[in-house]
């Protein structure tokens, strides 16, 4: 049979064939999703996306560090006055102040022993003239005198009887105008003028100080959302990788900059005890030690320098009346007697020459204001005012509407993939991962620079005192310290034991008399002590006080006649005196008679014409002849009161009246203005000593001993040591020789007054004091015996002419003269002629008497402020301090004022006519204040003579009365507000001597 092919064993595997073509896709499997694959490597960072929309505001950050201090801002305006702080602790005591002013005079000391009589004083001034003596006894008849010289020619005889009347002369020319008459009485005050136009706008004031920075504004409202950005191309979304493992710690970074100023740390624990410090500076003077035992009595000091001459003692008692002096010379003629009765009118004189032109009259009083003028043209525009203060921030505006969203843009075409870019910027940090494990601590960094000094922490509580340190080795002796400053004056130590009496010093001059001390309470009588040895002679005591007035002395002799005193003030006109003797014949008159006129016949009387207007006053006619002496007329009425004479000299100051009863206490006045800030208070007392410092470090080893230095200066005396135990009594030593006088020690503090010494022997008489003031006039002495008649004085001046004597009897006719007499004077006027034509109008007559005052007009409009008046006369030097007023309510804080200059008080002196009271209801407190003020004003106007209100005070309150007025709403009239100004009148004598300049600065005035 044909051989059957038998399969051989499998051959080796052939090589791999080429891949077949892909099969068709299998059906979609439905298995569950497999687990996510492992993270791939981080891809390269994509390009940064476009900025997203603005996120919502983040949470409030932690508080930042304090910034550096800003520059100093401008000073803000003064704030309102704060409430008074609590009183500070007392400061350390100040240095000893300068010596205080002399204290008030001490009380009067006891009367000293009477001094020896001084030498007679200088001759005093002549006493006042004595009273005239009585008439002396009639003298013996003198020897017959020789014949006197021929007397002067007698006075001219009286003129003869008047001759017959001559014919009427022609009418004289009119006389010259008379001198201007006296100024008429001022007319009534004019009506107040209309108010003036407003003044031009004043220049702008200086720019005010910058205001304080305003408070920080509130946070603004959240801004609107921005418009949506353009949509970016969509990025490929990678899955977020898991957080990688924590990396190794990096190398130490570069040294950081100094950190910001940290907050103050809490107090650290107390550090270890430090090394001993260097020796500290000498400490402050410790508190005064206990008073040491009294020192030994010092050596007597050198005699003091001669004291100053004491002030003159008070005048001694009046001496006895001296013997009568010789008669003085006749005094000067006395003052003129009182005005006599008014004489009869004299004869008409000649016309005098034309008088000189009178001085210009005083300017008339201010006339009434004229009618208002027409309105002026409109003024130019004034300059721009200063910029105003910055306004307050306005209210927050309303929110605007939200904008409409923009339209969406078209998507762009996809671009070709670009090449891979460079590595992008670091992406934004992912959300915060969980906290990793703590890494190993890094190596310590280099020490940073010291930070800024932190603010000091609060003061820690005082630590417990450390344990007492070991005592250090004794250091080398330090150099002598400078003597410490004088400590504060210690309290007065107890009185030491009295030392032995010092050597008697040179006798000083008498000291001034002390003032009288207050009488002490009477002590109980002590037991009688043993009589001590007489003390050394004391200084002469001050002169005693004036003794009681002595008994009335015997009448002294008349003193010398004094000089005539100055004429007194004219007294009131007396009643008419008795008729005086006939006066001497007057001198011969001038002879100026006219020529004789022909005697006219007397015409028949004409009918009486109409009275013409008064003609101008004719000139005075010539002097007529002296008529026969008339009979004595009846006594005239008392003359008018003469003009006041010059003021007499000031009278002596009267003695003060007895003290009046104490008035009831006034009501409290209104509160005064706030005073200026007071001076700083005195330095407070010394603080307590501080805690002891830690013990110092042991000093170095002692150096080799130096050579002994020269002795150092004497150190300040140490504090008194504690008293040692008493030693045993030593045996008495030999008496040493007296040491040299020591230098005078510094002046010690004033000791307390010692007990009074025994009265000393009278000292030598002091130098004569200055002449004491003249004593008061003594009582009027009794009339002394008549003195011898004085020699005749020179004849006095010719007295005034007496009143005309009684009319004498008619004399017998004289013999015919040798020559014919002068032609007689013009005869009396004839009877009236027929009426003439009406004459020209006469000159205006003198002003008539002032009419009665019209009824009060309604109050005028406000007048313009008057000019400042003159400064008033000086007020008294010192007023009494008024009672404290009730505290007022605190005022609102004022705006800061502009710096003010001084201004003149004088503006108050003009009356301001109208100031309506802004507050109608006046409360009780104001009423009571007004009442007490008016009482005080009344006491000032009529003082009661007590020491606090003497009678001769002249207070110038007039300006105060006229200064201010207010409207009384109830009655509707103006009242002077005498009590509404919170200041009294000031006069220059209140602020210094009359020749000193002084200024015043017055703040704004508040009305009640």
From Swiss-Prot:
Domain of life: Eukaryota
Biased composition (Pro residues): 1-21, 119-132, 604-617, 761-771, 884-896
Biased composition (Low complexity): 92-117, 152-195, 204-230, 339-354, 410-422, 437-456, 489-524, 537-573, 634-661, 717-735, 785-806, 832-868
InterPro entries recorded: Collagen, Collagen_Structural_Proteins, Fib_collagen_C
Domain Fibrillar collagen NC1: 978-1008
Keyword 4Fe-4S: no
GO molecular function (one): extracellular matrix structural constituent
Annotated stretches, region: Disordered: 1-920
Compositionally biased region (Gly residues): 133-151, 253-265, 696-709
Pfam families recorded: COLFI, Collagen
Transmembrane parts of this sequence: none
Biased composition (Basic and acidic residues): 39-53, 423-435, 807-821
Keywords on record: Collagen, Extracellular matrix, Secreted
Family statement: Belongs to the fibrillar collagen family.
The name this protein goes by in its record: Collagen, type I, alpha 1a
Organism: Epinephelus aeneus (White grouper)
């Amino acid at each position: 049979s044909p051989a059957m092919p038998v399969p051989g064993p499998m051959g080796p595997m052939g090589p791999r064939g080429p891949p077949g073509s892909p099969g068709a896709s299998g059906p979609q499997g439905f298995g569950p999703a497999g687990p996510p694959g492992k993270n791939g490597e981080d891809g390269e960072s994509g390009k940064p996306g476009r900025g997203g929309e603005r996120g919502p505001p983040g949470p409030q950050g932690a508080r930042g560090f304090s910034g550096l201090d800003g520059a100093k801002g401008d000073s803000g305006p003064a704030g309102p006055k704060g409430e008074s702080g609590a009183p500070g602790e007392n400061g350390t005591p100040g240095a000893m102040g300068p010596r205080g002013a002399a204290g008030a005079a001490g009380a009067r000391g006891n009367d000293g022993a009477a001094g020896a009589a001084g030498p007679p004083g200088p001759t005093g001034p002549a006493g006042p003239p004595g009273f005239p003596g009585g008439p002396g006894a009639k003298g013996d008849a003198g020897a017959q005198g020789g014949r006197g010289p021929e007397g002067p020619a007698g006075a001219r005889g009286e003129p003869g009887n008047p001759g017959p009347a001559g014919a009427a002369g022609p009418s004289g020319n009119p006389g010259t105008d008379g001198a201007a008459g006296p100024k008429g009485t001022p007319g009534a005050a004019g009506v107040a003028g209309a108010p003036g136009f407003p003044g031009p706008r004043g220049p702008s004031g200086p720019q005010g100080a910058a205001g304080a920075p305003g408070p920080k504004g509130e946070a603004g409202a959240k801004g609107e959302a921005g418009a949506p950005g353009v949509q970016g191309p969509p990025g490929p979304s990678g899955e977020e990788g898991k957080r990688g493992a924590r990396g190794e710690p990096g190398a130490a970074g570069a040294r950081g900059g100094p950190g910001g100023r940290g907050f103050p740390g809490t107090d650290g624990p107390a550090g270890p005890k430090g090394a001993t410090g260097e020796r500290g500076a000498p400490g402050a003077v410790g508190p005064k030690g206990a008073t040491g035992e009294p020192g030994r009595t010092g050596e007597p000091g050198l005699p003091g320098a001669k004291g100053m001459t004491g002030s003159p003692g008070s005048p001694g008692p009046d001496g006895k009346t001296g013997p009568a002096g010789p008669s003085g010379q006749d005094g000067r003629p006395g003052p003129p007697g009182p005005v006599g009765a008014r004489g009869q009118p004299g004869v008409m004189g000649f016309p005098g020459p034309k008088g000189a032109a009178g001085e210009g009259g005083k300017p008339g009083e201010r006339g009434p204001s004229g009618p208002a003028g027409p309105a002026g043209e409109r003024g130019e525009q004034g300059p721009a005012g200063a910029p105003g203060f910055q306004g307050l921030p306005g209210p927050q505006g309303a929110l605007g509407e939200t904008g409409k969203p923009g339209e969406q843009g078209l998507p762009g075409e996809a671009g070709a993939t670009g090449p891979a870019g460079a590595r992008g910027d670091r992406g934004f940090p992912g959300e915060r991962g969980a906290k990793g494990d703590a890494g190993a601590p890094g190596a310590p960094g280099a020490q940073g620079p010291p930070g800024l000094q932190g603010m000091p922490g609060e003061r820690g509580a005082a630590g417990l005192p450390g344990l007492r340190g070991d005592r250090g080795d004794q250091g080398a002796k330090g150099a002598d310290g400078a003597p410490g400053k004088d400590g504060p004056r210690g309290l007065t130590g107890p009185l030491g034991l009295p030392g032995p009496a010092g050597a008697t010093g040179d006798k000083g001059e008498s000291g001034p008399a002390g003032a009288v001390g207050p009488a002490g309470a009477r002590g109980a009588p002590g037991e009688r002590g043993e009589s001590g040895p007489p003390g050394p002679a004391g200084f002469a005591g001050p002169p005693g006080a004036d003794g009681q007035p002595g008994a009335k002395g015997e009448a002294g002799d008349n003193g010398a006649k004094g000089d005539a005193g100055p004429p007194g003030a004219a007294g009131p006109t007396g009643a008419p005196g008795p008729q005086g003797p006939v006066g001497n014949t007057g001198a011969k008159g001038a002879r100026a008679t006219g020529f004789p006129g022909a005697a006219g016949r007397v015409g028949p009387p004409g009918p009486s014409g109409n009275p013409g207007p008064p003609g101008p006053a004719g000139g005075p006619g010539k002097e007529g002849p002296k008529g026969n002496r008339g009979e004595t007329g009846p006594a005239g009425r008392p003359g008018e009161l003469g003009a006041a004479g010059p003021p007499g000299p000031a009278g002596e100051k009267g003695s003060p009246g007895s003290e009046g009863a104490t008035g009831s206490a006034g009501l409290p006045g209104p509160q005064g203005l706030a005073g200026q800030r007071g001076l700083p208070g005195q330095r407070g007392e010394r603080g307590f000593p501080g805690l002891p410092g830690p013990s110092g470090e042991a000093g170095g080893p002692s150096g080799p001993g130096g050579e002994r230095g020269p002795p150092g200066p004497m150190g300040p005396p140490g504090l008194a040591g504690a008293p040692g135990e008493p030693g045993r009594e030593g045996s008495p030593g030999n008496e040493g020789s007296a040491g040299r006088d020591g230098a005078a020690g510094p002046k010690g503090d004033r000791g307390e007054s010692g007990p009074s010494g025994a009265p000393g022997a009278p000292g030598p008489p002091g130098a004569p004091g200055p002449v004491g003031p003249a004593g008061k006039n003594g009582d009027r002495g009794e009339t002394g015996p008549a003195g011898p008649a004085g020699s005749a004085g020179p004849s006095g001046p010719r007295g005034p002419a007496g009143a005309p004597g009684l009319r004498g009897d008619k004399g017998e006719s004289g013999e015919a003269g040798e020559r014919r007499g002068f032609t007689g004077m013009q005869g009396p006027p004839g009877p009236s002629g027929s009426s003439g034509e009406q004459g020209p109008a006469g000159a205006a007559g003198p002003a008539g008497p002032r009419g009665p005052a019209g009824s009060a007009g309604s109050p005028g409009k406000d007048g313009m402020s008057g000019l400042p008046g003159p400064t008033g006369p000086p007020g008294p030097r010192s007023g009494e301090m008024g009672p404290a007023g009730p505290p007022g309510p605190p005022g609102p804080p004022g705006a800061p004022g502009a710096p003010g200059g001084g201004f003149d008080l004088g503006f108050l002196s003009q009356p301001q006519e109208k100031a309506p009271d802004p507050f109608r209801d006046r409360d009780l407190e104001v009423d009571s204040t007004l009442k007490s003020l008016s009482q005080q004003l009344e006491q000032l106007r009529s003082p009661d003579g007590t020491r606090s209100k003497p009678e001769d005070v002249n207070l110038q309150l007039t300006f105060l009365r006229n200064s201010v007025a207010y409207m009384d709403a109830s009655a509707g009239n103006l009242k002077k507000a005498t009590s509404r100004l919170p200041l009294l009148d000031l006069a220059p004598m209140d602020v210094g001597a009359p020749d000193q300049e002084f200024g015043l600065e017055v703040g704004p005035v508040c009305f009640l």
